[in-house]
Design a protein with these regions (language model features):
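Bulky hydrophobic/aromatic packing residues
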Residues: 1-2, 128
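Secretory targeting signals
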Residues: 2-60, 100, 115
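Hydrophobic alpha-helical membrane-interfacial segments at the cytosolic entry of transmembrane helices
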Residues: 3-11, 68-74, 167
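Alpha-helical transmembrane segments
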Residues: 12, 16, 49, 128-132, ...
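Residue-identity detector for glycine
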Residues: 16, 31, 36, 44, ...
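Terminal transmembrane helical anchor/hairpin motif
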Residues: 25, 63-137, 141-152, 179
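Alpha-helical transmembrane segments and their helix-start/interface "positive-inside/aromatic belt" motifs
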Residues: 52, 59-71, 160-166
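Internal/C-terminal transmembrane anchor helices
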Residues: 151-179
Length: 179
């Protein structure tokens, strides 16, 4: 999934450069393209990919999983209207990214990169946790219900996978308390 996201972001960069050249703007900032697409946006896409793998492993129905992911993506934007203002509970969100990540030639992103990357790292830790949890419940044999998958996951919970799952959960919670 990550390779596909990198490929699509590279395509966006190539098309953006082509549009700039077509409009006779020859001051192309490759570094800015690379940083914006691969350092800022790719992290969020990877976190969503972890969640997509998790939801797909829970439900057998592909369309139901896709619907739930779309519903979650649309629902997160409505959290402030429900009174949920804290970014620690709003999945893959960082503090007011429309304000914080405005780029200017004078000072770049300014003071806004540190809080943005802190929240991205926080949600990346959660993504790593759900990735390892997904490995526990991944359907390797024929199971019909979520309960059966959780039973299989309970039997698989040992060794390096359980250690990594616990470490990622502890890191996620610790970093959440730090922020």
């Amino acid at each position: 999934l990550v390779k596909m996201q990198v490929l699509l972001l590279s395509l966006i960069m190539i098309v953006g450069i082509a549009i700039q050249l077509n409009n006779a703007f020859y001051q192309i900032e490759i570094g800015h393209y690379l940083f914006d697409l691969f350092a800022i946006h790719l992290i969020g896409f990877i976190i969503w990919a972890f969640l997509a793998l998790f939801v797909q492993s829970i439900f057998n129905n592909t369309y139901l999983s896709l619907f739930l992911l779309i519903l979650l993506a649309l629902g997160i934007s409505q959290f402030p209207s429900l009174g949920i203002e804290n970014y620690l509970v709003r999945f893959n969100e960082s503090p007011d990214s429309s304000f914080y990540l405005n780029y200017s030639d004078m000072n770049g992103y300014g003071h806004s990169l540190l809080p943005f990357f802190l929240y991205r790292f926080y949600w990346l830790l959660f993504g790593i946790f759900i990735y390892f949890f997904t490995l526990l419940i991944w359907q390797r044999e024929l199971t019909n219900s979520v309960f059966e998958r959780l039973t299989v996951a309970k039997n698989r919970y040992r060794g390096k996978l359980s250690f990594t799952l616990m470490i990622s959960l502890i890191c996620f919670l610790s970093f959440g308390f730090y922020i």
